[in-house]
């Protein structure tokens, strides 16, 4: 091994080690957006910065993984019934808002209705719905006008 290769390898190894002396404060992620955030509500704008902020702050029932497959986030899971016309989504237990209040199915229904009233994709989904209701604190039901292939 050449001297320069040996020194470069040693330096790279030393630099790649963990920062053992970090405090909790140093582990805080600081996010610097590329633009000023003027609208906090992702429903009322199509600005990328607002969308990015929304994904960092708000949760969704489902998200997508690295292979773009749907994965439960706020949802624990779902059950399809009546040949794909009814989907019952169960929320994860113990989820809360920032103030400690539990997230209930009726909160999700209200958020979805608000989204469906404004967003073009929401309006498309609303056109497919016969009914959207909260069955109890942890379950909400989507009743579709016809079976929907997923």
Locations of regions flagged by a protein language model:
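Solvent-exposed coil/turn segments that connect beta secondary-structure elements
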Residues: 34-37, 66, 83-84, 92-94, ...
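Short, well-ordered beta-strand elements
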Residues: 26-35, 86-88
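N-terminal export signals
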Residues: 5-21
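Surface-exposed binding/hinge segments that line
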Residues: 90, 124-150
């Amino acid at each position: 091994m050449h001297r320069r290769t040996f020194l470069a390898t040693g330096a790279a190894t030393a630099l790649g080690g963990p920062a053992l002396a970090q405090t909790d404060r140093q582990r805080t992620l600081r996010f610097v957006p590329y633009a000023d955030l003027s609208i906090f509500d992702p429903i009322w704008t199509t600005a990328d910065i607002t969308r990015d902020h929304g994904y960092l702050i708000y949760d969704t029932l489902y998200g997508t993984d690295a292979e773009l497959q749907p994965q439960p986030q706020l949802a624990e899971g779902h059950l399809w019934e009546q040949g794909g016309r009814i989907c019952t989504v169960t929320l994860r237990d113990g989820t809360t808002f920032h103030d400690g209040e539990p997230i209930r199915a009726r909160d999700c229904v209200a958020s979805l209705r608000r989204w469906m009233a404004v967003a073009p994709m929401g309006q498309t989904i609303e056109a497919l719905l016969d009914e959207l209701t909260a069955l109890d604190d942890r379950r909400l039901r989507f009743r579709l006008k016809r079976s929907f292939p997923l």
